[in-house]
Structures are given as structure tokens and as C-alpha cells.
Amino acid sequence: MGRKPLVGISLKIYQNKIAEAVNYAQSISQLTNGENDLELFILPSMGVIYPVAQALHNRENVIGLGAQNIAPIANGALTGEFSIESLVDLQGHYVEIGHYERRTYFHEDDELINQKIQLTLKNQLVPLLCIGEAQQTTGAELKTVFKKILAADLANISPAQLATLIIAYEPYWAIGKAAAAQASYVAVAHTMIREALAELIGPTADNVRIIYGGSVSKDTAGSLVNNPNVDGVFVGRFGHDPQNFAEIVKIVKQVKLQAN
């Protein structure tokens, strides 16, 4: 199948109580039980990441655990931050880095994002790097935008280290909107990301999975992933219903298996 397709979800801070977070994690685990053709992950609200980790570990499941953020250092005086040491201890696997909301509201710059990526790789976890553009533009301009972001965020990291990197393409203008970006636009954007990445890290770019995030729903998932450069989807609020998340997984699987 080549690059293994991905479906993941970030709960941001929508599910912050232990009971609801655990129930959701158990529900999607049960609904996707036995799924081996896709890689699945959940990024729970940070305050409930421990009980969610316990819930996932206490049952047969294929849902990987990740964190929505980490501190740029593993240990030290950073009040209120979340250490990657905790995620490792929880047997987490993914680290979301560079989301639009972190870049915008918390003023995280490329240097800080680069530090977090390097720390994630040092701990043998998977960085999920989020990138996007502020407004719709042409393919050539998109490539220029993406190459600038990637060059800064991936600075001083060898291509060999980046084989496990996941890129989540989330156009800023589509986050939280009623509808996702058009599938044709997403296809061009993903192609430009891979081309920009290839110019920076060479053949390793072929191993990097690029998924789309931004108002993904069960109605749009199929058309969005119907392109060889779109390796999956990063779901938000339209996956808060476990049945909807499971349906998105089913749709992505059908499309990607048919394509191979």
C-alpha cells in the first residue's frame, strides 16, 4: 500500500471531564476494533490525557495516543507546560506541533517549533507538524509559502530523521469553518508540500505522510483523500460523535484501498 493511511482526531479542549473523555476514547476504540489497514490516533484534551491513556491501554484497541503540545525542553522550570517525559511514560506516540492556534494565540515561532520537533525525534516519537496558508492562492505561490515554513521548522534535522514525520496541512482559512477546502485545491496543496519537501530533504519526502485537516466530515473525507498525495485526514469537531469518526475511518479506508 506504500504510505499507510492515517486518520486522527484532536479534541482540543472540548472534552475536559474524565468521564466524557474516557467514554469517547472507549467508543471509538470499540467502533474501530481490528482495523489494521489504517493508522489511527487521538489527541485528547491535555487535562484528561492520563485517564484516556489508561482507557486505551486497558482494552484491545488500535488507537494511538498523542499530545496536542509539549514544552521545548524535557525537564526544567517552565511553569504550566507539558513535558514529553510524561507522554513517553504514558506510552504516547504522536506530538502535534505548530498548529495555527499555537502559532497565533501563543505566538509560537519557527525556532520554537523546530526545538519541539527535534525533542520529539530525540525521544523517538512522531512529530505531527501542522502547516497552512492564510488565504487561498495558486500552486506556485503555495509551494513558495510551504517551502519557507518547512525550511525553518525542519532546520538542522537530517533527512533520515524525518522519515517518520507527519505533516498536517490545515489551511488557516478552513479551520473551524462550515466546509472543508475543495478537494481539488487540497490535492494541489499536498502536491506542492511534497515537492517543497523533496527539494529540502530529497527522497525521504516520499516516506512522509501528509494528511488534510480543516472541517473534515464524513461527507467530505472521501473526495479529500482521493489523491495519492493525501495520506489521510486530521479530524476536528465533525468527529466528536464516535459514530461519525468511525464512518470517516471507513470511508478513508475504502478510498485508499481501492486506489492501491
Question: Which residue ranges define each predicted feature?
Answer:
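Active-site loop-to-helix "anion-binding N-cap" substructures in soluble metabolic enzymes
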Residues: 1-168, 172-260
